[in-house]
Regions:
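Conserved lysine of the Walker
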Residues: 115
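Hydrophobic positions on the alpha1 helix immediately C-terminal to the Walker A/P-loop
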Residues: 118
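A noncatalytic interaction/capping subdomain that flanks phosphate/NTP-handling catalytic cores
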Residues: 2-106, 110-111, 121-131, 139-245
Length: 245
């Protein structure tokens, strides 16, 4: 039986979503993901998170059988981070995020629908013009009416967690269908879908602020509903509507 590598050392600074963040990862899984985000500048930490062994072990017991303690640590730090960023006009959107034509596009879907499959189709269709930002937990922040998407070191087990940021082009909610079509999303369905994407990070203390963040994001971002199959034509259907020249 192999065990995750336990790290020696103390708290490290990282720059995640342009927030100086102190983390103390104990296992190599999160340390490897977080390394590209290491920060050596003079800014003071805005977020500080340290999790005890007792907390990590309690989280591990709640997770799917076979989950490693390293993966449980990554999941736990992700949850705490996403709670703390809410006051900074930021939110996690559970999605697969790509960089295309200088902008970030986030594709969100219920588990099993195929958000990662869809962004893989984009890579097949458009090759090196597409770069992956994060395949599970990108963050969006709003600055003076403009939204920016950020990669994070939290990968949800996908292995894709790059330190890339870009202006947000659109958020697309995916539904599976036999043929491909896309339409603009209405405000009530946007709020409902955003809520399900972020609900497990929201507490009573942060609920009002998160709703304010939703309102700000809806004001400055295009949202779409994409009904699609797994054919390469689905990427063209989405691209032709959401990418603005």
């Amino acid at each position: 039986m192999s065990f995750p590598k336990i790290l020696l050392g103390g708290t490290m600074k990282y720059l995640i979503a342009d927030l100086v963040t102190e983390l103390k990862p104990k296992y190599s899984y999160l340390q490897t993901l977080a390394k590209p985000f290491e920060y050596f500048g003079d800014r003071e930490p805005e977020i500080s998170i340290s999790l005890s062994d007792e907390y990590l072990n309690s989280m591990l017991k709640k997770m799917v059988s076979g989950t490693t303690i390293g993966a449980a640590e990554e999941f736990s730090y992700a949850g705490k981070f996403c709670q703390k960023i809410i006051k900074y006009n930021a939110m996690l959107i559970h999605s697969s995020a790509i960089l295309y034509n200088g902008r970030a596009y986030l594709f969100a879907a219920d588990s099993g629908v195929g958000k990662s499959t869809h962004t893989a189709i984009w890579r097949k269709a458009f090759g090196n013009d597409v770069k992956m930002i994060n395949d599970d937990k990108p963050v969006v922040r709003i600055f003076d009416g403009n939204a920016v998407a950020y990669g994070t070191p939290f990968d949800g087990g996908s292995g894709i967690a790059n330190n890339i940021s870009a202006p947000l082009g659109a958020v697309v909610f995916i539904e599976r269908g036999e043929s491909n079509s896309i339409r603009k999303a209405e405000t009530p369905e946007i709020i409902k879908r955003l809520y399900f994407s972020t609900a497990h990070f929201v507490s009573r203390a942060t609920a009002d602020k998160m709703l304010t963040n939703f309102e700000k994001l809806i004001t400055c971002t295009d949202f779409y509903i994409l009904t699609c199959n797994m054919d390469i034509s689905a990427a063209y259907t989405a691209r032709n509507e959401i990418v603005k020249n």
